[in-house]
Amino acid sequence: MDKFQIHGNGPLKGEIRVSGAKNAALPILCAGLLTADTVSLDNVPNLQDVRTTLKLLRQMGMQAELDGARVTLNGADVNVLEAPYELVKTMRASILVLGPLVARFGEARVSLPGGCGIGARPVDQHIKGLQAMGAEITIEHGFIHARAKRLKGARVVTDMITVTGTENLLMAATLAEGETVLENAAREPEVTDLAQLLVKMGAKIEGIGTDRLVVQGVERLHGASHSVIADRIEAGTFLCAAAATLGDLVLRGVQPDILDTVLDKLREAGAKLETGADWIRLAMPQRAKAVSFRTSEYPAFPTDMQAQFMALNAVAEGTARVTETIFENRFMHVQELNRLGADIAVEGNTAVVNGVPRLSGANVMATDLRASASLVIAGLVADGETVIDRIYHLDRGYDRMEDKLSAVGAKIRRIA
């Protein structure tokens, strides 16, 4: 099982090109199921979850070719309408085949999901929405089994904001008969990116980027070409690493306007920031000031950046309160950060972080995707050697992280 070996050694300096967003690429790949035509994608990140999704689509009969950051999909021969447990258990996003399969083929069997163990993340909103659109759904033997001759447009109000739920129902609605209105829809940039691809494929969607999506169903969708949006969480992770190490870093291939809350918090911590159309520069002249924040749905502070900011706060001046409102059980990195010398106490859904002047290297264990990123940041500023075990979590969401960090001065390597 691979590990990272890190020697904390000073500031990150240079340039990093940010990869395409995992959380946009996965639903966009599944959207290939909605048409028998060819869908061509660029800027697809080289990640374990992407490879798992392609494997799942191929098992269904999809032709899927991967060439660097380019993926070509053709769904003309899709004939297996099932997502098996072996693949779904490793990646919750497999649930995203449910809507497209029911919409185009009238049937789907999808195993109940797995993925990172950070809270319940129920799929009941997906099921409720599809039922409102006329699907008959049963759950038996660990599978969601959905059937519908043709989905019918409906008004769907989800009880909570759900990103994958919005994406699943949006894809299903594109081929439904009549008008579907999705109320309380997720507004994440990755949802917007999916919607923009669907429009290129011939879908009729209004309200893109808002919490109310109105979809006029069409008979069929056609092929299209699309470039996946930049990964705002990868960008934020590298910015936190630069801030923690008192670095000077330029990120290329990013969209600063989808990172507003993260950039605001970095400024509050003392970072000097410059932005252009597709780049961000961060320079950190002195030790960070502790920043308190509360996670919430976009456009508020993203839960996927909570752990990385906690690592920055761990070596900041002062005390920060970090409140997690999206997922329960998302403080598993606290124990590991404390092993490195951090002073963090958890009180319910809030962590109180007392900044310390320095951390010291130790053996730690990654527990989920973003927790592993926080440990990398902590390792970069810790004295001596840090070894992070179970980095397969990290590989699910970061494209060659060690190569990108090494190129800007980090002493980090992958060991078996």
From Swiss-Prot:
2-(S-cysteinyl)pyruvic acid O-phosphothioketal found at: C116
Main location: cytoplasm
Enzyme class: transferase
UniProt keywords, alphabetically: Cell cycle, Cell division, Cell shape, Cell wall biogenesis/degradation, Cytoplasm, Peptidoglycan synthesis, Pyruvate, Transferase
Binding sites annotated in the UniProt record for phosphoenolpyruvate: K22, N23
PANTHER family given in the database record: UDP-N-ACETYLGLUCOSAMINE 1-CARBOXYVINYLTRANSFERASE
Record-given protein name: UDP-N-acetylglucosamine 1-carboxyvinyltransferase
Organism, scientific name: Cupriavidus necator (strain ATCC 17699 / DSM 428 / KCTC 22496 / NCIMB 10442 / H16 / Stanier 337) (Ralstonia eutropha)
Gene: murA
